[in-house]
Amino acid sequence: QQSDIAEIVVPRSPDSHKGSHGTIAIVTGSSQMAGAALMAAHGAVRSGAGKVFLRVPGKVGPYCIGVQPEVMVKSVGTGDCFTADDAESIIAESNHWSVLAMGPGMGRDDGTRDFLKRVLEQVTCPVVLDADALNLLAGEKEFLSAIGHRLIVTPHLAEFSRLSGFSLDEIKDDLIGRARAFAADWKVNLVLKGAPTLIVSAKTGNVYVNPTGNAGMACGGMGDILTGMIAAMTAHQGMSDLCSAACAGVYLHGAAGDACRKDRGPYGFTPMETADAVPSVLADLEKNLALPILQQPLIGGK
């Protein structure tokens, strides 16, 4: 509920700066799906990230540079998709990042799988994994569980089936049970996207059911926006843990979609428009919070 999210998305300190609100790295994309990378970056920007870096394969860079001036884009390597040879430059940069997001539009090339695993083995920051990152790591239980404490994985039902090995029927027959079992077994924080979306804590096994969102959000790209939003929430000043960040990102994403539905109706609003609604949703959330003493207005000059 909104009151739960208000407790974990704390107001910005008046003396904060861009470094206080996290350095988000979106490392993803391929020549056929540059838009997915751009949408993930946009989701992070609109959710209040202090700085957003976008790292894309060499041939993708020209399609991304300058599209959103707030996003700092750099090409990595020379190909249409990431390869194992590209991993070292990402690993070297990762020491400066608060959180890393990977997967949207990444493609399923074998070289990209090698790249992904090399990066995940070496980085130490929290990581949000979505889309093709999950498809590439399907069945890699031993690998993922070894680093699961710093992961948030965000599959929809089909991706969850490929990743976990559960059939779609098994998942639908016991959604909460399968989600909880997976998070415990694989030792990851899980966002199982659907209607409703479930969030499961790797630490406690607690399951949270998101109340926001609507059928107008059932279109390509919404998950990419969510990836960026969860990454931004992970780096939000005062955020206590990865599961809380996932809950906040999912709730705000759905609430932004609900705002779009209210303004435009249930048809045709876009993922980018949904991201653009997030600042207003956050502003509404903040109105219901007590202001810290430094942000309270002075009355009578005292």
Predicted regions, residues:
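Small-residue (G/A/S/T)-rich helix-start motifs and N-terminal tracts that mark the onset
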Residues: Q1-V127, N135-I152, L157-K302
